[in-house]
Amino acid sequence: MKKGMKQIFRQAGIAAVLLALTCGSALAQEQNASSKNDDSANSKEEGNRNVMLNAASANGPREIQIGLPSADVNVLENGIPVTYATNPHSVNSLWRADASLSHVGLLKISETAITTGNIGYAVNSFTQLGQKGFNGTLNYKSNHFGMQEFSLNLNGDIAKDWYYSGSIYQDFDPGTFKIKSTPFQDRTQIYKFALTKKYNEGRGELTAIYHYSNSHPVYMYATQSAPFVYVGDGSVKEFGQFALGTTSYLPMDNEMVYRDMRTGEVCKTNLYDAVQNKGSEFTLMNNYTWDNGLNWKTIMKYDHSTGSCVYQTPMSLDQNEAGINYLYEAADGSMKPYTGDYVQSRMSCLNRGFIDSFMFTTELSRKAGNSTWRLGLNEWYYDIDYASATTMYDQSVPTDGSYPVRLYNADYATYADRTYAGNGYYYDFNKNASEYYKGHENKIALYFTHDWDVTDQLNLYYGARLEYQALRGDNAAVKNAEGNYVGRFADYYLGATAADGTKIAPTPMSYDWLNYALTAAATYKLTGQFGLTGDFTYITQHPKIENFAPATLPNTDKISVPLGRAGIYYNNEWLSLTSLFSYISKTNNNSTLNLQHKTAAGQTEIMAAPLTYDIKTLGWTTDVVTHPFKGFDFHFLFTYQKPTYKKYETSVTFSDGYVGQINATGNIVAEIPQVIVEIDPSYMITKDLKIWTSFRYFSKTYANINDAYYFNGRWETFGGLNWQVNDKLALGCTVVNFLNQTGAKGSIAGAELIEKEDAGQYAGHVMAGSYIRPFTVEFSASLKF
């Protein structure tokens, strides 16, 4: 039996002992947050956030901004994360908001911090278990680009106190543009089966669940970038006939050659196979309530999976003047000179990890008088063997909107500035962002919460979490004889030899840390409708095992995240208003920048620069829900925030002696808007027919670390019509981006070293970056039987 498996079963035994010692307790219970409820500040879920309306994805939950850079979207099912780490096993590859779920909501930041040790909102979902009789739900969704999505759940009883539930999810999504390498940009299938036994006259409920997923999220790399002309005033215009969002920027060829990080062997694969994710999960859940109201819930899940993330990251986009003898394969198979104006270099990243994880959570809770207390325990074990192989290649940048082609260096055998292997297409294997780690991470935590109505006017909610984190394994952060990190070089792998004679071998790592989280919230009613509210959450963390993937060790100091909010609320029969001031900061963020510099020879050199930095954000949020007349609902959310970098400094020396330096301390954090507005009106035309819209405004965002480039504010818009035909059938039509906005968002590839004073000279230049999801019409139907 593998060592990793032995570790998992040992952890399972420890978890069982801990369960017996602590008597367990209740998973975060589903509570629908009502903005009209005075106690909503202390419910575990947020309301009015439309978490599944996502302008970046057709089938995944959106990220809710909290003033910090993008991080993992936390998604829970039955109270535990659906995946321990989203690289390499992404949420969308094994979880969808489909017919297999009985509930999808959004946990508050404080609840997420106490129960998981993470910061941010979390999607909160529960599996649809068997009910009496025979029940079924069939959901169907399509769009005008040809997406076909099916979701089916069947459940019922098979004998006294025995219940079943089975679900199937199938997604065939070609995306918003055709690519030559595969007919689908998302091909995902998910199967679930649950068997439930109720016992002791219904007081207890024991459930076993099997979950299988197989997913090819091609969109991960297919929609990663596109070329555009940066005008210089925050706007962009289309490059030639390349339509953003509806034209493919991927080369026609699906092949990828790489050097295996573990063995050094040069291998060939195709991108569709490289991005495959598959997993098998086994879950046991128990829920028991004693006659005195004491409730015990426990869940344990074993996950055996292969996770994969593939990126085709745009690096430099330069004019075709570097003196390279580029050829391309024409339609007839002949090699012809490339005479296009531009050349796009890309870095292919093939990330794959083999995962065994065990998660155990148990909670004990009871409502006693005017308070509810909860005691919980997490035992989470994560074992992974992970590597990321990188390959550089060049492609054409066609102005006519045709498919790009890979470019071949006819002089590759004698070309001095790059290291080719076998042919003139692929070069500099594993030189830039290649990664490796193998080991396990274990977290065991004890937490409690207390929700207490002290008086009719005062409610207090507080909790704490104490977590022990252990990390063991190997990575490839190798030092030479002088004690300096070797870094990555061309043809890097475990067993290679660096230029200074250093042998590349796995480096052991072993860490033990204590983390904790504290939260407190208070609501005081000055009148029956008006009151004061405030909350504070403080969480400490340490690096996770994936932070040890690069060529240097991360900063292992404590990461601290304090979040405080205070304000007022007002409720009456037709209006609910909350207005809060907030502060959030985060210390010791670990990151690695791939800095680019054009040498005197005209070649673009890429160097990795690790750094550690802090962030702080001041903000003000006002949330309004109103019902001015029958059938009409209106939600308005306004947020102003000012996220800034603290201690953001790094530098790297390129081969020609040029020192690339970044000092972004005091700058606005890249890609985060300072103003966010959400407007959500809806109207019931009849009791069965609803029309609705959702507008989201994001103000100007900076597109590089130095705040030199920026994109103007943009609207994300949704609208739809929902018709409840009868108690069995519901139909819907949704329009995404009905204002038909086009343009860029996010960051600009290769722009990290550009300073503000130099940005003007790049006006009118062709660049590459991410873009807004195009106009899309979606159709849906839901049949219950």
Region spans (language model):
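Outer-membrane beta-barrel transmembrane strands
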Residues: 66, 262-311, 343-388, 427-461, ...
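C-terminal beta-signal and adjacent terminal beta-strands/loops
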Residues: 29-31, 697-702, 723-785
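Repeated loop/turn-to-beta-strand initiation elements of outer-membrane beta-barrel proteins
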Residues: 135, 161-164, 201-206, 293-296, ...
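Acidic, small-polar-rich N-terminal luminal/periplasmic segments of exported/outer-membrane proteins
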Residues: 29-133
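Structural signature of Gram-negative outer-membrane beta-barrels, strongest in the C-terminal barrel
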Residues: 355, 372-382, 387-391, 395-418, ...
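Acidic/polar loop-and-plug regions of large Gram-negative outer-membrane beta-barrel proteins
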Residues: 183, 196, 205-283, 308-350, ...
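Outer-membrane beta-barrel translocator/receptor signature
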Residues: 86, 99-105, 112-193, 199-206, ...
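Gram-negative outer-membrane beta-barrel transporters
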Residues: 456-457, 574-576, 580-587, 595-597, ...
